[in-house]
Amino acid sequence: MSTNDANFMLFSNINDCSYVSCYCEENVWKLCEQVKKTYPSELPKCYAVFVSNERRTVPLWRQKAGRGDEKLVIWDYHVFFMHNPSPNRCLVFDLDTTLPFPTYFHKYVTETFRSDYALTPEHHRFFRVIPAEKYLAEFSSDRRHMRRPDGSWIKPPPSYPPIQTSASTHSLDDFICMKPGKGPGAVYDLLHFVQQFYKPPDRNIGTKTQN
């Protein structure tokens, strides 16, 4: 299928994607790597998105690790992958959601983040959006955040070696940080994140504007 086809999907089967529980930042890095290998022309249209806040307490719904019928969980941070091939089409690939893989941006945001209005300020979600190419070049992690004080693993790590760059062995905190103007990519609050990536259908097309 051509990448210009309206039904084209970068990843057609979630089971073909690299996945290790509780290592969402590496899972998304692997998705970026896969696109670079298989559909390099699409890489400029792809993003890694970190969700967190100053207190690192962000509520997300529809998560496999969540509780209750609505699958609510509070993470310190979360990471998902986005493909934005055209202004009116943006798909979210989240390996940890109970929603379909992928899910259209508006549905994903509506069901996963809902609204900040009903939440206390310390639970408001912020989003660091990083172009996939930049994420591949600058992200690194020695997985220290997944070790207990005695050195044992909180969750088993991926079988492949830690992701490193020539400049850093552990840049994860730079990506989790939600201070605007600091770190890679751009930081948005929920409202501006939606405005940036969701373009509602133009219902005024074909109608005459009255002055």
From Swiss-Prot:
Keywords: Hydrolase. The keyword Hydrolase applies. GO terms for cellular component: cytosol; nucleus. Its EC number is 3.5.1.122. It comes from the Eukaryota. Disulfide bonds: none annotated. Mediates the side-chain deamidation of N-terminal glutamine residues to glutamate, an important step in N-end rule pathway of protein degradation. Conversion of the resulting N-terminal glutamine to glutamate renders the protein susceptible to arginylation, polyubiquitination and degradation as specified by the N-end rule. Does not act on substrates with internal or C-terminal glutamine and does not act on non-glutamine residues in any position. This is Protein N-terminal glutamine amidohydrolase. The lineage of its organism: Eukaryota, Metazoa, Ecdysozoa, Arthropoda, Hexapoda.
